Swiss-Prot record:
Protein name: Phosphoglucosamine mutase
Protein modification: Activated by phosphorylation.
Gene designation: glmM
Protein purpose: Catalyzes the conversion of glucosamine-6-phosphate to glucosamine-1-phosphate.
Domain of life the protein comes from: Bacteria
Swiss-Prot/TrEMBL catalytic activity: alpha-D-glucosamine 1-phosphate = D-glucosamine 6-phosphate
GO CC annotation terms, alphabetical: cytosol
Length: 445
C-alpha cells in the first residue's frame, strides 16, 4: 500500500479552513472521487452530514465537484454515519459520502466514503482518488453534468431499519430511558426509535446549533447523562457521538458502560440465544477484563489494530459477526455493515428486557481492570515513538507490571497525538506509570 497524502484511518479530517478541509479542496475531492467512481457504472452518490455549521459549505463544494465529473448527488440532510451506509446500500448508489468529524469539536470536519455495499472504501479506491487529485479538473459535457436532489424520507427509512433490528416479540414498555445525542446527527432519529418501541424517553443534547456538537455531551463526555439518569430515576442512559457511530451507556446507578462492556453483553446474549457465530473482535485498546470474561464463557477473542475499519477487516478475515472498540464503535455484521450506536443500544436493551435484568446486572460478569489513557500532543514531523528515551521508559514500566498488565503506545490516526495506555491491577500504580511514559513523550515531543 502506497503512502497516503490525504486519507487517514477514517477518511479525510482536519480543521475547517485549513488544508485539506477547504471549499476548493473538497470541490476537487468531489471531482476526483466522481472520476474514479464513474468507472464502476452507477452515477448516483448519497451525501449525508452531521450538524456542524461547516457541513452546508462542504456539501455544496462536494456537489459541484461530483456534478463536474458527471455524477448526481442525493442529499439526506443531517443523518448518522451508519444511516448513510444503510441508504447507500438500499438506493444501490455507487458510494455514500459522510461529512463529519465524528466525536471532534465543531470547528473540525471531515469526509469519509462508503462503497456500494455500505462498507468503507477499499484502500485501492482511496489511492485512485488521491491519484486523480494530482490532475487538473476537467468538466464533462454540459448534457452529462450531474444533478442534485434531496431524499425527503431518509430519517423515516432509517428509523424503521433500526426498529427492525429489535426482536418483534419484545418492546420497551415501562422502561425509562435518557438519550444524549451530542447535539449531533442522531438528534431527530434516536429519540423516535426508542419512543416508538414503547420507552419513556428523556432527551438531552438534541438541540443542535451548528457549533455545540460534542460540547460537554455525548459519548465522549457522559457526565451530564450520568447526572440526568440519577435525577430522573431512569433505567438506562444512552450517549451517541456527533455522527452516531459510537455509543456509551450509563446504568441506573449512574455508572458508565463502555464499548468493551457492551460487546460483552451482546456476545453473551448471542451465545445464550444460540446465535453466536465464531468469536468476538476487540482492539489493542480493549480491556483485559473483556478478554478474561469472554474466555470464561468459552467465546474466542482476538485483537485488531485500533480503528473500526481494522475491526471490520478482522471480522471478515475470521468470518465472525461481533466486534467493538472500547470507545463505543460496535460492529454487528448480522445487522449492519459499520459501527451503529442506535442498533448496538437496541441489542443491549433487548438483553435487558429478555432477561428481566438491569444494565448494571448484565455487566456484573465482567470486571474491568484499571486502564489509564493519557493523550500527549506533539509538534513537528518526527515520531516520538521512535525515541530511545520513550522506548526505554515503556520497557521499564512493562517489566514492573510483570505480565499482569499491558503498555500500549500509539499514534492517533486522526490528530497529532500520542496515546499512552497502561493497564494493570492497581489504579494508582498504572496512573503513575502512564504519566511517567507521557512525561517522556512530552520531553522528546
Amino acid at each position: 500500500m502506497s503512502e497516503r497524502k490525504y486519507f487517514g484511518t477514517d477518511g479525510i479530517r482536519g480543521k475547517v479552513g485549513d488544508s485539506p478541509i477547504t471549499p476548493d479542496f473538497v470541490l476537487k475531492l468531489g471531482w476526483a472521487a466522481g472520476k474514479v467512481l464513474a468507472r464502476h457504472g452507477s452515477r448516483k452518490i448519497i451525501i449525508g452530514k452531521d450538524t456542524r455549521i461547516s457541513g452546508y459549505m462542504l456539501e455544496s463544494a462536494l456537489e459541484a465537484g461530483l456534478a463536474a465529473a458527471g455524477l448526481s448527488a442525493s442529499f439526506t440532510g443531517p443523518m448518522p454515519t451508519p444511516a448513510v451506509a444503510y441508504l447507500t446500500r438500499t438506493f444501490r448508489a455507487e458510494a455514500g459520502i459522510v461529512i463529519s468529524a465524528s466525536h471532534n469539536p465543531y470547528y473540525d470536519n471531515g469526509i469519509k466514503f462508503f462503497s456500494i455495499d455500505g462498507t468503507k472504501l477499499p484502500d485501492e479506491v482511496e489511492e485512485a482518488i488521491e491519484a486523480e487529485m494530482e490532475k487538473p479538473i476537467t468538466c464533462v459535457e454540459s448534457a452529462e453534468l450531474g444533478r442534485a436532489n434531496r431524499i425527503v424520507d431518509a430519517a423515516g427509512r432509517y428509523i424503521e431499519f433500526c426498529k427492525g433490528t429489535f426482536p418483534n416479540e419484545n418492546n420497551l414498555n415501562g422502561l425509562k430511558v435518557v438519550v444524549d445525542c451530542a447535539h449531533g446527527a442522531t438528534y431527530h432519529i434516536a429519540p423516535n426509535v426508542f419512543r416508538e418501541l414503547g420507552a419513556e424517553v428523556i432527551t438531552i443534547g438534541c438541540e443542535p446549533t451548528g457549533i455545540n456538537i460534542n460540547d460537554e455531551c455525548g459519548a465522549t463526555d457522559v457526565r451530564m447523562l450520568q447526572k440526568r439518569v440519577l435525577e430522573e430515576g431512569a433505567d438506562v442512559g444512552l450517549a451517541f457521538d456527533g455522527d452516531g457511530d459510537r455509543i456509551i451507556m450509563v446504568d441506573h446507578k449512574g455508572l458508565k458502560v463502555d464499548g468493551d462492556q457492551i460487546l460483552y453483553i451482546i456476545a453473551r446474549e448471542a451465545l445464550r440465544q444460540g446465535q453466536l457465530r465464531g468469536g468476538a473482535v476487540g482492539t489493542l485498546m480493549s480491556n483485559m477484563g473483556l478478554e478474561i470474561a469472554l474466555k470464561q464463557l468459552g467465546i474466542p477473542f482476538v485483537r485488531a489494530k485500533v480503528g473500526d475499519r481494522y475491526v471490520l477487516e478482522k471480522l471478515q478475515e475470521k468470518g465472525w459477526r461481533l466486534g467493538a472498540e472500547n470507545s463505543g464503535h460496535i460492529i454487528l455484521l448480522d445487522k449492519t455493515t459499520t459501527g451503529d450506536g442506535i442498533v448496538a443500544g437496541l441489542q443491549v436493551l433487548s438483553a435487558m428486557v429478555r432477561n428481566h435484568m438491569s444494565l448494571h446486572d448484565l455487566c456484573s460478569g465482567m470486571k474491568l481492570l484499571p486502564q489509564i489513557l493519557v493523550n500527549v500532543r506533539f509538534t513537528g514531523n518526527h515520531d516520538p515513538l521512535q525515541s530511545t528515551e520513550v522506548q526505554q521508559v515503556a520497557k521499564e514500566v512493562e517489566a514492573e507490571l510483570g505480565g499482569k498488565g499491558r503498555v500500549l503506545l500509539r499514534k492517533s490516526g486522526t490528530e497529532p497525538l500520542i496515546r499512552v495506555m497502561v493497564e494493570g491491577e492497581n489504579e494508582e500504580q498504572v496512573t503513575a506509570m502512564a504519566n511517567r511514559i507521557a512525561d517522556a513523550v512530552k520531553h522528546v515531543g
